[in-house]
Amino acid sequence: TKMTKAERTSMLQLLQSLPEWLSPLCKTNIVIFRGDSFQLKVTEPTKALQIALAIRAIIRANKFAGNNEQWDARLAIGIGTLDYETDSLSTSDGEAYRLSGRGLDLIGRARLHIETPWEEVNNELIVSTLFADDIVTRWTPSQSRIMFEKLVKNNSQEDIGNILGVSRQMVSKTLKVAKDALISVYIKRFKELINERTVWERQ
């Protein structure tokens, strides 16, 4: 990634703030390495997709160091067991970490990829993930700001408008253009698939 020193510093500050910003959804831990690369552990696997989309939204919403260029992130979600945990994510190991790594190898030109231990789940999600990725990649900064509030806090349109200083009508119009309804269906189906498998494996 070609970023100036000021942009990297600004991006680093944002990444370090992610656990706090994402806390309304669930607890997360982050490790940052190689400048703007990072790994995030999510304590509730059914919320992994929602968190990934929220991360892309907040990055796309920000102007780093005042630069007008819109940045994004390439994210690979790995769902699985954790075999070995330490205080640092960089030295922890397990199925989830390995699947996330494999996802990054397979992501190609896309910016979102999901790998699970279940082939039928992967097969179902691959097409919908490509469509969702295309939608998110088109979000403008203003759309991204509103989508972040919706994804993380699920606030009403009026509340989002009050937080961001825009009218409820503008929020409604923006959510429609950003295809919030389709994103919500995608997230709902992901949660159902992961919950079905994890509940079955716990029995």
PLM features: what roles do these ranges have?
Residues 1-203:
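Regulatory and interdomain segments flanking nucleotide-handling catalytic cores
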